Amino acid sequence: PISNMEEVLEEENVTFFAPTNWSIRKSVALLNKMWYQMGNDSIKNLKQIKPSVWREYLSMYILKDKYTLKDIPQIDTTAIAAYPGQTFITYGGLPMNVGVVYGDANGVKYVGPRQILYSYIYDITVSDLKNAYVATSDIQPKNGVVHVLRMTDHDFGFDRRLFALKAIEEGIDELSQINKTE
């Protein structure tokens, strides 16, 4: 198990904002670049990254309980005082803002398509948010709901540099160590 979170995702009632493989690849690519610049061989297996790192970063995307699009309040980033969305605490204890963006249609405000905006509250003192839009919402497995994040503009962990630094700080396992345990 890469993160030791299988039980949470399979058994508990949760909402999972699923990052795409592409966003994970981008973050790991930066980690590989930094790791290589430090004189180390490239990471060839995701299991070389400690489970504690995967757990910390995957926890950013998991909320306790089930929240479908209809359960989430409106957010308007241009009128945040009126439509702020809602702050939730992730499985890992971080504050995240979640809101539904109501699009405009034919010049009429808020009657168009709706899209969930999942935002990491980077600095709560200045309301600094790192946003991730949902591409597909309300996938409902047996124990919760999954919202898949857009791949084009999201980095795993909301900041791939911080992910890379955390992985380096925790230590990268040698590939030979991983192969012995498999």
Question: At which residue positions do the language-model features occur?
Answer:
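Mature, structured domains of secreted/extracytosolic soluble proteins
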Residues: P1-E182
